[in-house]
């Protein structure tokens, strides 16, 4: 079996404003559960942005409750999350995309850390 590299994704979804706050919280928890169980991802960060006004109406609503979730997965089961969004009427808009910028930043930090460790170990070895 080939190794598939873990990628960083951002998933933003908007919950209809007529859904009670308690139900919105449960819906966010369900999305997190789907990411962890079905998508086999690891959640890095959940941002509840709250109610925001839209620039234009979406499904006859002028505002909605925004949530952004950053997570890591191999991308093979990402369609499970999209299917959940599609069949959930309380979620009126969603978008999931890969964050190349965050992946690049993480790789750079790893390279710098490895270089610093290499310098540290070579300096430590010459003292003996």
UniProtKB/Swiss-Prot annotation:
Keywords: Ribonucleoprotein, Ribosomal protein, RNA-binding, rRNA-binding. The keyword Cytoplasm does not apply. InterPro entries: Ribosomal_bS6, Ribosomal_bS6_sf, Ribosomal_S6_plastid/chlpt, Transl_elong_EF1B/ribsomal_bS6. GO terms for molecular function: small ribosomal subunit rRNA binding; structural constituent of ribosome. Pfam families: Ribosomal_S6. GO terms for biological process: translation. SUPFAM superfamilies: Ribosomal protein S6. It comes from the Bacteria. One of its GO terms (cellular component) is ribosome. Belongs to the bacterial ribosomal protein bS6 family. HAMAP family: Ribosomal_bS6 (MF_00360). Binds together with bS18 to 16S ribosomal RNA. This is Small ribosomal subunit protein bS6.
């Amino acid at each position: 079996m080939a190794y598939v590299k873990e990628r960083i994704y951002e998933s933003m979804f908007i919950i209809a404003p007529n859904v009670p706050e308690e139900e919105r919280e449960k819906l966010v928890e369900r999305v997190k559960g789907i990411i962890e169980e079905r998508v086999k991802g690891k959640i890095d960060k959940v941002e509840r942005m709250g109610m925001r006004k839209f620039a234009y109406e979406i499904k006859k609503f002028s505002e909605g409750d925004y949530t952004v979730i950053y997570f890591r997965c191999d991308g093979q089961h990402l369609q499970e999350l999209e299917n959940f969004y599609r069949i959930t009427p309380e979620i009126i808009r969603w978008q999931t995309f890969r964050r190349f910028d965050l992946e690049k930043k993480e790789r750079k930090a790893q390279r710098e850390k490895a270089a610093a460790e290499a310098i540290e170990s070579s300096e430590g070895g010459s003292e003996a």
